[in-house]
């Protein structure tokens, strides 16, 4: 992921990855624009939207197979502040799709942060105050466009954590992972 680099350095890095990966039969997802939030214990406080003027040059010069764009999503379970109205920049998505017709577009940081999982976690000893994600209707709108993949890692982590916390509260003496992970 070279999205934190300058445009030129992102192209250079992504092209190197593409050349190596394609030689080994592996596809590559490039990324333009930077998402805020926490990913892999790295905290990025500021985001930058994908500039549609850059996408054709980036895809052409790198040879990437799909492109992750930044339209207002962010990593982690705390994407928005309470009372904040989540807004995704569908105008950017539409313009990118117009400039790259039939090219696979990806959204990173698009977990909906399912309230039921947050509730289970909090009811079973967790503390996820004000965890807010992307509204499902916005994800459905994105999926109906050129978006072919929506990354929802935080939702998977929340579901797993909710299940584990609930299991341990109901079965406090359990210590055999085969019984609670199997």
Can you annotate each of these PLM segments?
Residues 1-104, 115-132, 136, 140, ...:
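Alpha/beta enzyme core
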Residues 107-112:
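Short catalytic/ligand-gating loop segments at beta-alpha or beta-beta junctions
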Residues 123, 134-182:
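C-terminal alpha-helical cap/extension of soluble enzyme domains
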């Amino acid at each position: 992921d070279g999205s934190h680099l300058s445009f030129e350095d992102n192209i250079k890095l992504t092209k190197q990855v593409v050349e190596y990966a394609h030689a080994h039969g592996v596809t590559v997802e490039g990324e333009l624009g930077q998402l805020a939030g926490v990913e892999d214990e790295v905290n990025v406080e500021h985001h930058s939207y994908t500039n549609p003027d850059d996408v054709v040059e980036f895809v052409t010069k790198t040879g990437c197979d799909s492109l992750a764009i930044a339209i207002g999503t962010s990593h982690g379970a705390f994407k928005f502040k309470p009372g904040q109205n989540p807004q995704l920049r569908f105008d950017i998505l539409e313009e990118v799709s117009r400039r790259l017709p039939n090219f696979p577009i990806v959204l990173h940081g698009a977990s909906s942060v399912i309230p039921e999982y947050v509730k289970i976690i909090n009811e079973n000893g967790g503390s996820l105050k004000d965890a807010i994600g992307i509204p499902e209707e916005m994800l459905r709108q994105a999926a109906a466009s050129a978006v072919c993949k929506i990354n929802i890692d935080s939702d998977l982590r929340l579901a797993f954590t909710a299940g584990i916390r609930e299991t341990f509260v109901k079965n406090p003496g359990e210590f055999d992972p085969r019984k609670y992970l199997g």
